[in-house]
């Protein structure tokens, strides 16, 4: 996998590329002779550093989606809020959606900045037991576009995993970009040695979303990433007055439930549409504290409990 040193030029091909040290973009780079010699194409020393840095993190969960716009980052934010409601748990949320970092907005942290200490980057805290890190904190404006090639994104992800000082953490939730790209390969490669519990895959009921989720599931199998389960988001609308459910996005091919049965993957639950979810993301507040008794909140709580049960069961299996 190609990677980019921090002091590399903008169009660096990456240390693992066959063009490393030879490309026109390499002219004048302080690393040119080292890259050209091939000494940087060996095992990445950062892998052991990441393993050591994350040794204090008990559970690591990736949140994936095959398609954008299905509520992946929304789920990541609410998963973090839900887990952090237990004050005895330390929770961390890492946003590696490099080109579309929405977590700062959803967590009410826009305008916050990252500070460096002797032990690494200090995350930004929402609550005493909920820490957040995102590339959005490194931008001068939330409207700035991140126009990076894959190798530079990989370098940023490596730096997040290696340099952020999370401390003792029970759950690290990693919000990824949609699809299967360089970022996903980087995260899986770096976390494979640190121990990753698995992935939660977010979808909506429509076939156009499910077909991309099937690709995501195949990706997980190929890279040996365990699948915790699938969450069907925007699954119907429950009227707050009459309590009847309407299918806004009808599951024309059986929805996530049939897909999970066909592919032998766990369905963690279905989250109904609720306009208050979008409102809470826009205002950066926890949906659980704002609307504690809504059907969506109850669904989230069930899903979060199933994720916790999976992680605890896996921990027992690993040590037995």
UniProtKB/Swiss-Prot annotation:
Sites binding [4Fe-4S] cluster 1 sit at 12, 26, 29, 35
In which domain of life is the source organism classified? Eukaryota
Q: Which InterPro entries does this UniProt record tie to the protein?
A: Mrp-like_CS, Mrp/NBP35_ATP-bd, NUBP1/Nbp35, P-loop_NTPase, YlxH/NBP35
Q: Which cysteines are joined by disulfide bonds?
A: none
Q: Which cofactor does it need?
A: [4Fe-4S] cluster
List of residues binding ATP: 66-73
- Residues binding [4Fe-4S] cluster 2, per UniProt: 239, 242
Q: For this protein, what does the record note about how its cofactor is bound?
A: Binds 4 [4Fe-4S] clusters per heterotetramer. Contains two stable clusters in the N-termini of nubp1 and two labile, bridging clusters between subunits of the nubp1-nubp2 heterotetramer.
Please give the chief subcellular localization of this protein.
Answer: cytoplasm
Q: Name one Pfam family in it.
A: ParA
Give GO terms for biological process: iron-sulfur cluster assembly
UniProt-annotated stretches for the region Disordered = 1-23
Record's subcellular location: Cytoplasm
Keyword annotations for this protein? Answer: 4Fe-4S, ATP-binding, Cytoplasm, Iron, Iron-sulfur, Metal-binding, Nucleotide-binding
Cellular component terms (Gene Ontology) = cytosol
Q: Which GO molecular function terms does the record list?
A: 4 iron, 4 sulfur cluster binding; ATP binding; ATP-dependent FeS chaperone activity; iron-sulfur cluster binding; metal ion binding
Which HAMAP family does the UniProt entry name for this protein? Mrp_NBP35 (MF_02040), NUBP1 (MF_03038)
Q: Which family does it belong to?
A: Belongs to the Mrp/NBP35 ATP-binding proteins family. NUBP1/NBP35 subfamily.
On assembly, the entry states: Heterotetramer of 2 nubp1 and 2 nubp2 chains.
In UniProt terms, what function does this protein have? Component of the cytosolic iron-sulfur (Fe/S) protein assembly (CIA) machinery. Required for maturation of extramitochondrial Fe-S proteins. The nubp1-nubp2 heterotetramer forms a Fe-S scaffold complex, mediating the de novo assembly of an Fe-S cluster and its transfer to target apoproteins.
Q: What is this protein called?
A: Cytosolic Fe-S cluster assembly factor nubp1
Q: What organism is recorded for this protein?
A: Xenopus tropicalis (Western clawed frog)
Q: Specify the taxonomic lineage.
A: Eukaryota, Metazoa, Chordata, Craniata, Vertebrata
């Amino acid at each position: 996998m190609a990677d980019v040193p921090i002091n590399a030029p903008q169009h660096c091909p990456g240390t693992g590329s066959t063009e490393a040290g030879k490309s026109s973009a390499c002219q004048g780079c302080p690393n040119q002779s080292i890259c050209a010699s091939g000494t940087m194409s060996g095992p990445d020393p950062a892998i052991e550093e990441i393993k050591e840095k994350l040794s204090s993190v008990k559970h690591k969960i990736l949140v994936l989606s095959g398609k954008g716009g299905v509520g992946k980052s929304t789920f990541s934010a609410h998963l973090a809020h839900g887990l952090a409601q237990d004050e005895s748990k330390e929770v961390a949320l890492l946003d590696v959606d490099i080109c579309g970092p929405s977590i700062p907005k959803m967590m009410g942290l826009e305008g916050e900045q990252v500070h460096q200490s002797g032990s690494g980057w200090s995350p930004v805290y929402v609550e005493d037991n909920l820490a957040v890190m995102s590339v959005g904190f490194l931008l001068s404006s939330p409207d700035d576009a991140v126009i990076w090639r894959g190798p530079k994104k990989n370098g940023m992800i490596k730096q997040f995993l290696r340099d952020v000082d999370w401390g003792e953490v029970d759950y690290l939730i990693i919000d990824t970009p949609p699809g299967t790209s360089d970022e996903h390969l980087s995260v899986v490669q770096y976390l494979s040695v640190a121990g990753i519990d698995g992935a939660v895959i977010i979808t909506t009921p429509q076939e156009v979303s499910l077909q991309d989720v099937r690709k995501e599931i195949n990706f997980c199998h190929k890279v040996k990433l365990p699948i915790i389960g699938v969450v069907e988001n925007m699954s119907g609308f429950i009227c707050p007055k009459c309590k009847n459910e309407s299918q806004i996005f009808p599951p024309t091919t059986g929805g996530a439930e049939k897909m999970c049965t066909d592919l032998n993957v766990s369905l963690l639950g279905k989250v109904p549409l609720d306009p208050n979810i979008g409102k809470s993301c826009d205002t950066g507040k926890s949906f659980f504290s704002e609307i504690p008794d809504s059907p969506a909140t109850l669904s989230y709580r069930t899903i979060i409990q199933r994720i916790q049960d999976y992680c605890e069961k896996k921990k027992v299996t690993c040590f037995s």
